[in-house]
Design a protein with these regions (language model features):
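Detector for the mature cores of small, proteolytically processed
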Residues: 1-49, 53, 60-70, 78-145
Length: 145
């Protein structure tokens, strides 16, 4: 697949990004902080190199395990409140999970394939590919979107 360098259609304005983040801080972070009695993470940072490496990895592993990887689903999570997680213990995180469609081989000559098997299964989490985590917990230096 050729790399696209055009402007992505999903871009938003800095003003709207600021509004989204302020809404999160007002309607989610403040409630969470009262419950866990400490300030939670409000951003997670991954380097471009880490993300590109993960994308390359999931495409290659998907192909090896019979999946056409077509996306990444981002899940929210919370680290266990255990010492081994140090400063991340009890804090929010995100992890990335490859999604895709199982590659279906065409039936051999003379074989009949049922309608159910021919149907598209849609974007599903690819359980044969490990999720990615361990970005840097960030508290953005300022809301300068």
């Amino acid at each position: 697949m050729e790399k696209q360098t055009g402007r992505p259609s999903q871009l938003i304005t800095r003003k709207f990004a600021n509004e989204l983040h302020l809404n999160f801080m007002k309607y989610r972070a403040s409630i969470i902080a009262k419950y866990i009695k400490k300030e939670d993470a409000n951003a997670i940072w991954f380097s471009v190199e880490e993300l590109e490496n993960y994308i390359h990895y999931i495409k290659a592993k998907g192909k090896k395990t019979g999946f056409d990887v077509n996306g990444i689903r981002i899940y929210f999570g919370v680290y266990p409140d255990q010492k081994k997680y140090a400063e991340k213990a009890g804090l929010m995180t995100v992890f990335l999970q490859a999604t895709g469609k199982e590659i279906r081989k065409a039936p051999k000559e003379g074989e009949v394939q049922t309608f159910a098997l021919m149907m598209d299964s849609g974007e599903q989490d690819v359980s044969s590919i490990e999720p990615m985590n361990y970005g840097s917990i960030g508290r953005p230096p300022s809301l300068n979107y």
